[in-house]
Amino acid sequence: MSSTSARALAARARGPRARSTRARRLGVFASTAGRGVSRARAVTRDDDASADSTLASPGVASAIPRYGEGGCFVDHCDAATVSRIREALLTSTSTASRTPAAGPGCLSSLTFAVKDNLDVRGARTGAGSPRWLAAHPSPAETSARAVDAFVNAGAVFVGKTQMDELAWALQGQNAHYGTPTNPAVPSLIPGGSSSGSAVAVAAGFCDLALGTDTAGSVRVPASYCGVFGFRPTHGAVSMLGCVPLAPSFDTLGWFARDAETLRRGGDALLPDDVVGVDFAFVRAAVAEDAFEACDGATAETLRRCVDRLAAKNARVFGAANRRGVRLGGGGGAPAERERDPSPDETRDARGLPAAPPLAEWWDAFRALQTREVWRALGGWIEAHDARLEGFGPGVRDRFCAARDAARDAKADPEAELRIVARAAATRDAAAARLRELTRDGAVVVLPSAPGPPIPRTSAAREVEAFRASQLRLTCASGFAGAPQVTIPAAALAEAEDGETGSGSAPVGISLLSAPGTDKALLALAVELTEEASSRRRG
């Protein structure tokens, strides 16, 4: 798709009212050195043309390719295919997937893209894998429920996006298709596995983009690309029509450049909150050990964000209602613990259930996820790539580990039961801890990622180490099945904070709440970032 045709499509989809000459700003990026923010240049859209949005430095986003190396859209769903699919979706999409909360036209005039592990009727689903694409040569006969919901709500489909191979990575790098260019800082990774969706939104190619999140695949790229991202309550949004990874952790998610658009996406996808429409958050728990897991500069930037949260909503985040907590216990890594904790050690100083340290959360998550992945995909892999020769580095290692774990389980069932039981106990303790921390209207504040994105040229060992540090933070909502919203740190900045230059890399802060409070959490994100959104609109 050419830049001209894509811009024309976006302009037609938005309608004449949205194609005004009013400037639109895509956001601001916080400096990881704690020196304020770098504000994006305003971009004007008019009836004749729709300029690509420019992010961290002039000309960066306009240079982001849509297809090919560095592009965020897949080649097997090209411009002609998109045009044909779009017309078919607009005329014949079933209304069966419309949620009770989705009013007709709640996404009218908005455009959206779809991660390539989600089915779109008339398009092939590649899941970031040439082997998967070759094994599934026929276009999907039906769309994923979430795609139908967006179309029924009035959104216009503009393409399918690149992703990490079979969604089992977090860096956004695909050995077969390349790495989508991060519009914020092109030399850094965009994050994954929903890399193309985050980039498409950040670059202004669409208003919303669907992704999936098993262990951070929406929250991490949202943080790295400087956009908003949402992982809903597990099971709140149907996963029908999605290539699975680890079903007990898999969720659908979505991206937007501002919280109001993110909320509108939730209106199309989410059922009503179980807590009712009058629910309000009343206090905050700041996860101190999660902040300690960040690099020093990121922790400093995000702690200033916590202060800004208090300035914007004292009812929830003010000193009287805010407290520091630890998600996990204070013990060392598993190898350093010589005994199981005594009953007295299972409660923290406030009498709340204690949980193992965050490092143990990640170990447990990895053990459970690895086994689920092989149950979900092992049969297909054995049939199509038994020697795992068609996978890229990192991803291949993880599938090898999953296969070996399955073989070991058959060879020694008792040992397997012990491994799974220990991991499940950690999961249950972590989930209980988060239930206590989010009860009665509390929201947990934690980093979306431990630092800014690393360079695209990083060595494999550095990539894997950074992935592990990310997962220590992101597995929390997976264990709890809880909703989590990623907010760009810069969206909380004050207008007078000024600019730090074009080299500033985005970082994100997250709010996590109890399962079933999704819409309330999205509304809180809108409230907290309303000032920044108004500046961008103005």
PLM regions: where:
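Structural helix-boundary/capping segments
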Residues: 25-27, 34-41, 45-70, 152, ...
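Gly/Ser-rich catalytic/binding loops embedded in alpha/beta enzyme cores
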Residues: 32-206, 435-436, 500-502
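Amidase signature
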Residues: 29-106, 271-472, 479, 494-499, ...
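N-terminal chloroplast transit peptides
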Residues: 1-23
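Short glycine-enriched loops at secondary-structure junctions
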Residues: 116-118, 162-164, 233, 450, ...
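Short glycine-enriched, charge-decorated loop/helix-capping segments at active-site entrances
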Residues: 127-136, 459-464, 511
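A short helix-loop-beta submotif of the ANL/AMP-binding
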Residues: 154-155, 475-483
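Short, hinge-like loop/turn segments at secondary-structure boundaries
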Residues: 131, 175-178, 226-229, 462-464
